[in-house]
Amino acid sequence: MKPPSSIQTSEFDSSDEEPIEDEQTPIHISWLSLSRVNCSQFLGLCALPGCKFKDVRRNVQKDTEELKSCGIQDIFVFCTRGELSKYRVPNLLDLYQQCGIITHHHPIADGGTPDIASCCEIMEELTTCLKNYRKTLIHCYGGLGRSCLVAACLLLYLSDTISPEQAIDSLRDLRGSGAIQTIKQYNYLHEFRDKLAAHLSSRDSQSRSVSR
């Protein structure tokens, strides 16, 4: 007869034959109201669907189906392809497209910021989605750093009156104190309007010189 300790070990041993069960909780989406920047739409933010990393065990098929059932039409993904592989969802972008969700992939390094030209492109694409009343979601890995940075930039992009601090506060009220995670991201927000204006001015100058 086996000693009790070995019986317990065999009963609760999580071997390859008995994989850890995926989480059954619905994926949590936070909806940012854009009413304060004269837009009637909401922008969704969430963590990486289907993520399997450390103690997180989500089911990518289930999460994707939930997003589809929520009516999500466009998704902006800020994870790099390397991250998608690391977090065990290497085919996530294809899966979105198979579900009929339009996918906008704008990779930003974890903890980092996009260059201003890339950020301007993201702002223009987001604005187009929202103006066309498309239900839009953005996500990175945790839904706190890069996603909140982009959402805060959108608030500044859509309104001249909201301040960087107010934009940060809006995201922290929505996603918690971990939103906007690095000094680099914090500084980027405070410099965003000046850099955007310089970029747009340069782009206009180039287009004028080409058309001559």
UniProtKB/Swiss-Prot annotation:
InterPro entries hit by this protein: CDK_inhib_3, CDKN3, Prot-tyrosine_phosphatase-like, PTP, Tyr_Pase_cat, Tyr_Pase_dom, TYR_PHOSPHATASE_DUAL_dom
| Keywords tagged on the record | Cell cycle, Cytoplasm, Disease variant, Hydrolase, Protein phosphatase
An annotated GO cellular component: perinuclear region of cytoplasm
State the conditions that upregulate or repress this gene: Up-regulated in breast and prostate cancer cells.
What's the impact of mutating residue 95 to F? Answer: In HCC; patient BX-05
**Subcellular location per the Swiss-Prot or TrEMBL entry:** Cytoplasm, Perinuclear region
Which SMART domains does the UniProt entry name for this protein?
Answer: PTPc_motif
Tell me the enzyme class: hydrolase
Domain Tyrosine-protein phosphatase: start-end pairs: 33-201
Name the family: Belongs to the protein-tyrosine phosphatase family.
The associated disease is: Hepatocellular carcinoma: A primary malignant neoplasm of epithelial liver cells. The major risk factors for HCC are chronic hepatitis B virus (HBV) infection, chronic hepatitis C virus (HCV) infection, prolonged dietary aflatoxin exposure, alcoholic cirrhosis, and cirrhosis due to other causes.
Annotated protein name in UniProt: Cyclin-dependent kinase inhibitor 3
Q: Which gene encodes it?
A: CDKN3
